[in-house]
Amino acid sequence: MANESKCPFNHAAGGGTTNRDWWPNQLNLKILSQHSPASDPMGKDFDYAKAFKSLDFQALKRDLTALMTDSQEWWPADFGHYGPLFIRMAWHSAGTYRTADGRGGAGSGQQRFAPLNSWPDNVSLDKARRLLWPIKQKYGRNISWADLIVLTGNVALESMGFKTFGFSGGRADVWEPDEDVYWGSENKWLGGDNRYGKDPESMQPPGEGTLVAEPAEHGNEESRTNQGERNLENPLAAVQMGLIYVNPEGPEGNPDPVASAKDIRETFGRMAMNDEETVALIAGGHAFGKTHGAGPADNVGPEPEAAGLEEQGLGWKNSFGTGKGADTITSGLEVTWTTTPTKWSNNYLENLFGFEWELTKSPAGAHQWKPKNGAGAGTIPHAHDPNKRIDPTMLTSDLALRFDPTYEKISRRFLANPDQLADAFARAWYKLIHRDMGPLSRYLGPELPQEELLWQDPIPEATHPLVDDSDIRALKGKILASGLSVSELVSTAWAAASTFRGSDKRGGANGGRLRLAPQKFWQANQPEQLDKVLKVLEGIQNEFNAGAAGKQVSLADLIVLAGNAGVEQAAQNAGHTVTVPFNPGRTDATQEQTDVESFGFLEPHTDGFRNYAASTYRVPAEALLIDKAQLLTLSAPEMTVLIGGLRVLDTNVGKTQHGVFTDRPGTLTNDFFRNLLDMGVEWKPTSKTEFEGRDRKTGSVKWTATRVDLVFGSNSVLRALAEVYASSDAKEQFVTDFVAAWAKVMDLDRFDLRQ
């Protein structure tokens, strides 16, 4: 601006010192309102599943196949084929998934946004997505970016001679970055000290992320690298800030293949991959393409989020030589693994075991490996000069597959049996790109495999007539006459439904897995009480199914219906007549359809809705409540009304009375909020996590509470919501809102209802 000093606006709206700057420990409630309809340009009536079904899928695949060899001057294809670049794009989109909280993954196209679009491990993937833009533009809303990124990786494999296991669409895009994902607390790229506990002073304040609580279960927070062990902070699944998995040079840049194997096993395991799947993914993925380290990293400019406007969303502008083609700098490593980098082969393993390797450095100065004594010289094609041949090279993380005893055994078997590698890679790749898709009812398209896969948490289809309104009324009558309390009915239904995670769409009441291992043994589910309730409900189920002339009710449905009956009874106790929405159609999975180890990741070690914590955590309980609420896709008002209702329904684990601010438990009243906001009560801590509320006049203890309870009076936003429900005219609204939020949680996994 020519006269900038006279501009009346020195700062734009939203700038300046923020509340978070003043109070860095402030509870982050914004994660409960992200991805609102206001941010979605597609409109509230847009149905992506319907749009995808109208897609000319085969025409799209033909266009993608043609793109693979349509090299562009502005970003030339290595070896004349973009396939390896697109495989990396899809892999790095899906590979952010982690089992601990189900977050990350390819499910919403987050690679387009910060921080992922600017991670050091994603250098040059901005170019991959830009190459795809003409195709995305052509097909528009019928293919999401999330689906297109993954499908392009699949087509890339097929175009280079590999037979994939299948593909499913159904990943709807979002339009802003996920703010709920904890990627670590380091404040510099490729930092890793905090996640291994070596620099605790620089960690973010409590409330940021979920740090390890129980060493026996998750490992200590302190690093024990000197003893050969590294203990990675939960829920992270990458060794350094901005990496997908491991440092390819070795742990902290130390070129030790055996140590690298430990990092690989830890990080791939946290992405739900076992040793065989891990070897297959690495050996299969590295059958193609190359890495890029033509020159020193100081030639590379800022990442996309820091680049100038003129770069138009691209980043990492390279001043080395031409800045592209043979002069490309991505990881700083310059490795080509095979003689056939654009064709499926077993040459990766042939080279890995066919040569003895010695340490060398890339042109950028990064640790990598070459065959000893010049073996294999000139056997590898040059990516951009058909008249040149180069030597084989490997990464430290590649040599891990040879020098780790377990990985070596698997790798040698794949070397001797290429068909086994092909099958294992096809299956592991399919799992990688679909791990966060949820139940099969969300899968779309003509290339779905017919085989039932255990990691998909299969649920049988209902093959019998469902219960009707008359049956539902009769069943609720039997449930309420069974002798089970409101608390028992509601607690059991919550235990089943609240395992749902909106992140990877796992869990929920459908499947009836509450009656199976491991869920029936979880401490949070109160196994003794659960066994009692399930026996009663199974009796009602058996009686109904024996005399229903073909109609059947699953235990999964009956558990939810029992919870609904409890809520309706509690509302009636308070003078309100309500009917909780109920949608039959859930079925019961078998123990054989249930991966006990995999379901273990859904176990709630804390659940603020039930005032439950298995142990003391570094992160405050109220922050963990917000985390749980976000996984349940709840808004702040929904979370608030559920807490208030569940407390007065006496659903705390172990029947503790913390937060049960009522003298009429089992009655659906707004007593929790009225008594929480009562200025006649003074609160004092009895420990870091528990409090007593004493009558200001008499000094006698009226109530006890946890941090989760008191945050609804302490946090200004939550207090504003609590005041709504504590008001004299809010009794009916409270019941109505509780019923709506309850019904939402009960149906979170019913994707079949939304098709």
UniProtKB/Swiss-Prot annotation:
GO CC annotation: cytosol
PTM characteristics: Formation of the three residue Trp-Tyr-Met cross-link is important for the catalase, but not the peroxidase activity of the enzyme.
Presence of keyword Oxidoreductase: yes
Known partners and oligomeric status: Homodimer or homotetramer.
Residues joined by cross-link Tryptophyl-tyrosyl-methioninium (Trp-Tyr) (with M-271): W91-Y245
Binding sites annotated in the UniProt record for heme: H286
Protein name as catalogued: Catalase-peroxidase
EC number: 1.11.1.21
Listed Gene3D superfamilies: 1.10.520.10, Peroxidase, domain 2
PROSITE patterns (alphabetical): PEROXIDASE_1 (PS00435), PEROXIDASE_2 (PS00436)
Organism: Pseudomonas fluorescens (strain Pf0-1)
Pfam families, A to Z: peroxidase
Biological process per Gene Ontology, one example term: hydrogen peroxide catabolic process
Catalysed reactions listed for this entry: H2O2 + AH2 = A + 2 H2O; 2 H2O2 = O2 + 2 H2O
Gene: katG
Family note: Belongs to the peroxidase family. Peroxidase/catalase subfamily.
Stretch list, region Disordered: 193-229
CDD domains per record: catalase_peroxidase_1, catalase_peroxidase_2
Residues annotated as site: Transition state stabilizer: R88
